[in-house]
Amino acid sequence: MRMILEKIKEANDVKKLSLSECEQLAQEIRDFLIQSLSETGGHLASNLGVVEMTIALHRFLHFPEDKLVWDVGHQAYTHKILTGRKEQFATLRKTGGLSGFPKRKESDCDAFDTGHSSTSISAGLGLVQARDLKGENYQVVSVIGDGALTGGMAYEALNNAAELKKNFIIILNDNEMSITRNVGGMSSYLDHIRMAAPYTELKMGVTNALKKIPKVGDGMVDALHKTKSSIKQLVIPGMLFENMGLTYLGPVDGHDMRQLGKVLQEAKRKQGPVLIHVLTEKGRGYEPAMRHPARFHGAAPYEIETGLPKSKGNPSYTDIFSTVMRKFGDREPDVVAVSAAMVPGTGLKRFGNMFPERLFDVGIAEEHAVTFAAGLALGGLRPVVAIYSSFLQRAIDQILHDVCMQNLPVVFAVDRAGLVGSDGETHHGCFDLSYLSMMPNMTVMAPKNKWELSDMLKFAIRQKSPVAIRYPRGEAYTGLEDHRAPIEMGKAEILEKGKEIAILAVGNMVRTAVQVTENLRNCGYEPTLVNMRFVKPLDMDLLEILREDHSLIVTMEENVKSGGFGEQVMTHYGSRLHSPAVRIVAIEDKFVPHGSVEDLMHQQQIDSASVTERILRWKEEQQKSTEQLPE
């Protein structure tokens, strides 16, 4: 039998299928995703949960005229398949390949580039307002998960949508999870709604039955609508949304395409914003993902039979952080941990298992997490806030205003710093050195290897002011084990003493700098290699010492050049006479796409081979310039 999936070549092909063919298509898409992602890795569990819902949306909408905005966007794989991108899935999240998130440059059926949480309603509402002001006619649908509803931005947008009263469909994809199980009052509220699922089915059934009564049926429906407001407080499950000014429809079975089609048509007939509450099952159709959905959030390539990873690496920096936090939990009763819905991802799961009353998962609410930690610190506790670098950007004002301005002892464990690889622009942590370094009272550190991360965390918890420690995704570096001088505030570590060329490396770039140093030695140079440890405060004493017998200072960081470590060093030397030349190795002023970290470092010319070549060229230019000076 010919596969239905083979008929899907471009957007709107799904409209040619019968309902039974769509149901077969859903199973074929699941089979395809399970097989394909076992080779490439990717966000499996969330995508398996929205297959029927996505097909129903594609039967309802007309692409690219209508606009579908995905919150976060990691669950848009079925959408990509239905818009003609199935053949590219072998390249998913690889260098130059298919993105794991919606990308407007990839398809005109992708309405908005996403990657972070709780943004879809705001973006969709903006499209709605633009549509109406320009007198255009198309549908806008925003899909947001129940986990994303723990983020305050979603409520700001819902409030605005209710005020504007524009025709706008919002789908709440409720699978009871973000990455892990949701927390907080909204989660409890949605639990209550799920228990009342028959309400919408009953309401629609009564309305249809009344309309069939000759002559008086429509009048009875009108009367029912006029009186329902007095009783719906007792029975309606979505009262919170109704009270905000939105029409609530649901809960609806997110795996029943017939029911989904009916409720989408009903939403289209309504005036004003409509929220459709859809119940889905994360990982549906693949037993390992249903049992362990968090493990299959952003899965590495896996064995289909077991769901286990095809390869297991050495301990990561996150693993090291996890181990140290558990040890601190044993010894220091005032140490507490704060997570913004990323407990397993940041390595806090074991800490939470051992000390559940000292782990605070606040949901997808980075701004709240930081100010909450400020309050914990004021109350005499020692909070450690573990957040991915790209998500910490969302709380810049809170770090500056609520923590740094009051000089509070909050430790920021900044995970996934630098280039993270396959998730691309939205997830690289390339800006933290710049925005954290500009904040008064903030200390900024970066470890060269796994032992230094442990030492830095111990040092940070002892401080009486804010400290940020940034470390990368992936396996922790185990080289330079013998270089473990005690951590001193603002002091760097000289790994090799040389002359003429000094390489000042930050954090993960020390590993690269070690290879660069060896390459330069093979070319006849004797470079000095420095592990900076601190980006703020800088080791000014060391910088002055290096002036004496070095003509070229090369800084290396896995951060954007603008406002970063290198520019700070350049500013220091620029204010002094007879200073060495400074050259910066950093990420240029552009967003870095997805791909392997190795490929991306080469693209950015911050890998060891590229840096060696650049230093040799700079040194050659410097020598030519010296030769041209008049005697």
Identify the meaning behind each predicted range.
Residues 5, 176-321:
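Long, well-ordered, tryptophan-enriched scaffold segments
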Residues 1-82, 246-248, 253-260, 277-280:
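N-terminal amphipathic, basic-rich helices that act as targeting or association modules
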Residues 43-164, 317, 334-335, 340, ...:
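Cofactor-binding active-site loop characterized by glycine-rich and histidine/acidic residues
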Residues 262-265, 297-298, 316-331, 347-353, ...:
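Glycine-/acidic-rich phosphate or pyrophosphate-binding loops and their flanking alpha/beta elements
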Residues 301-302, 309-313, 421-423, 443, ...:
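Peripheral docking tails and interdomain loops at the edges
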Residues 67, 272, 280-393, 398-408, ...:
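Non-catalytic terminal/interface segments that mediate subunit docking, oligomerization
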Residues 220-288, 409-414, 433-482, 581, ...:
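Structural signature of the thiamine diphosphate
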Residues 88-98, 163-177, 198-201, 404-416:
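A glycine-rich helix N-cap at a beta->alpha junction
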